[in-house]
């Protein structure tokens, strides 16, 4: 059987004024990715799958994000806000290509899943001309009601127009819709604007399809999956729902989350086997964690790689570009940025390792700082394998510390150190016998 082609149109033209933000609504992040990114990730992918995004005038940032995520995306601009059907028809050029399945989604519903899109498409494959996504609302007030005759959808009744009996219905319209792509324009072009707002409503497609002798059906999903986001409070609710989903997926994959509700994950976080995450850990985008790794409490990780059997934290921070080799350890109050730590490296306490490459099995003592910035440019620190850096050491980059070299505690190292060398840089210690007693006695006499 030949695979069905698809066109997914994502409506992202809204201003999002209730967000009270200069950032376009669909670009607000959920689990480290924009809302738009989540919707596009759920849309059908691969051969025969096309994506179009409808944006508002001047929404260059939304266009840029869409193209970052899907280089082949088609961008269409809805010049006037005249309703959802009008927005869909902004992509007329793409619709006219006649994909088998036309999907209409919204850029502010980031919890939509690929499985739900697949179920909508399956309904079309089984002969429906229209499949509308519905949900059972806890409080249906304000939602359009889905009116059924047996298994067929006969109408979508807006709340304001619904009778008392219809308002008692809890099956509500989510807005997401699938349509027979070959019949889509014939249906959409029939939608009029004879209503109080003079707008073209996509929900009218149901009545038009039925008037053409075509079947419409409802596909049900959970209310959480289709919850739209219009305010920062709703954004927080969506974040909570997404985090619950990500935590459950991680635990299902074998990750131990000791206090799941306190751990924050990104949508693209990947885990190996037997990973343990302690409470109050934040994992941002671009993080992979290898087999047997342990992330202790109050650690923060972004765009970093943790190898197998690594230990991180507590109170550790990994910034972008950091890679921990197998068995490496980053301890408490250590920050690493753009640093490669080879297998077995230990940085146990109170250190900053930035723009650095640390060779295997090196030991970095407490209070070590790689001084990587001269006020204008960042510079590299290279530490060879098996090196020992004493406590309270400053390594002024650019600098190379040789393999198996020793750096004495309290040193400020400004020149390269060869392999197997010992480098010390500190003032000679001065000890004056009895001076403390003399100082103390003098102070006591002054207080009498």
Curated annotation (Swiss-Prot):
Q: Which GO terms describe its cellular component?
A: cytoplasm; membrane
Has the keyword S-adenosyl-L-methionine been applied to this entry?
no
Enzyme type, top EC level: transferase
Key words, A-Z: Acyltransferase, Cell shape, Cell wall biogenesis/degradation, Cytoplasm, Magnesium, Metal-binding, Multifunctional enzyme, Nucleotidyltransferase, Peptidoglycan synthesis, Repeat, Transferase
A Gene Ontology molecular function term of the record: UDP-N-acetylglucosamine diphosphorylase activity
PANTHER family, alphabetized: BIFUNCTIONAL PROTEIN GLMU, NUCLEOTIDYL TRANSFERASE
What protein name does the entry list?
Answer: Bifunctional protein GlmU
Q: Where is this region: N-acetyltransferase?
A: 254-448
Q: Which PROSITE patterns match?
A: HEXAPEP_TRANSFERASES
Q: Where is this region: Linker?
A: 233-253
Catalytic residues (UniProt): 349 (proton acceptor)
CDD domains (UniProt xref): GT2_GlmU_N_bac, LbH_GlmU_C
Which positions in this protein are listed as binding Mg(2+)?
A: 108, 230
**Gene3D superfamilies membership:** Hexapeptide repeat proteins (2.160.10.10), Spore Coat Polysaccharide Biosynthesis Protein SpsA, Chain A (3.90.550.10)
**A single Pfam family, by name?**
Hexapep
Q: Which residues bind acetyl-CoA?
A: 366, 372-373, 409, 426
Which superkingdom is the protein from? Answer: Bacteria
Question: Which cysteine pairs make disulfide bonds?
Answer: none
Q: According to its UniProt entry, what is the function of this protein?
A: Catalyzes the last two sequential reactions in the de novo biosynthetic pathway for UDP-N-acetylglucosamine (UDP-GlcNAc). The C-terminal domain catalyzes the transfer of acetyl group from acetyl coenzyme A to glucosamine-1-phosphate (GlcN-1-P) to produce N-acetylglucosamine-1-phosphate (GlcNAc-1-P), which is converted into UDP-GlcNAc by the transfer of uridine 5-monophosphate (from uridine 5-triphosphate), a reaction catalyzed by the N-terminal domain.
The Swiss-Prot or TrEMBL record describes its family as follows: In the N-terminal section; belongs to the N-acetylglucosamine-1-phosphate uridyltransferase family. In the C-terminal section; belongs to the transferase hexapeptide repeat family.
Name what cofactor the protein needs. Mg(2+)
Q: How is the cofactor bound?
A: Binds 1 Mg(2+) ion per subunit.
Which reaction is the catalytic activity of this chain? alpha-D-glucosamine 1-phosphate + acetyl-CoA = N-acetyl-alpha-D-glucosamine 1-phosphate + CoA + H(+); N-acetyl-alpha-D-glucosamine 1-phosphate + UTP + H(+) = UDP-N-acetyl-alpha-D-glucosamine + diphosphate
Which pathway does the UniProt entry assign to this protein?
Nucleotide-sugar biosynthesis; UDP-N-acetyl-alpha-D-glucosamine biosynthesis; N-acetyl-alpha-D-glucosamine 1-phosphate from alpha-D-glucosamine 6-phosphate (route II): step 2/2; Nucleotide-sugar biosynthesis; UDP-N-acetyl-alpha-D-glucosamine biosynthesis; UDP-N-acetyl-alpha-D-glucosamine from N-acetyl-alpha-D-glucosamine 1-phosphate: step 1/1; Bacterial outer membrane biogenesis; LPS lipid A biosynthesis
